[in-house]
């Protein structure tokens, strides 16, 4: 039987292992888009444990007979001008260990995270998933998510001859244009 519970500091190794696996999975799917660092487990585990004391975040684990077999990390977020969305709950990570996929752990993690988000006053939940991750997309659609955005990525070679200048603010002077330059 799989139960969902809040993560604890004692889960750090399992969280790190699954976070590292998630990073490798994304990088393998598109190494130009997703980063890969050597031995991400320790850092990922520390980061997720740091979220346990953040009142705007929740990290839940799927526990099967005392063994952590998956996790979800969600947060409460405000308005995002960058993403053109209102306040929402955001599911940053969800991962279930391969041997237990299909046994309901992912669905149970999602339901508990969504309940936590609702209890924190948000009426919308947002997440991203890889374009080619059909299993995850089917899980999300089955829980009631709908597709709203598609990320597009273009890889370009930087041009060494182009210097990017920051835009000036009103009333600011550029080099050679200020009172000290006259």
Task: Enumerate the language-model features and the residues they cover.
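Conserved N-terminal entry element of GNAT/NAT acetyltransferase domains
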Residues: 1-13, 158-182
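Conserved GNAT-fold acetyl-CoA-binding loop/helix
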Residues: 20-47
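A short helix-loop-beta-strand connector motif used in the catalytic cores of GNAT acetyltransferases and
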Residues: 46-60, 90
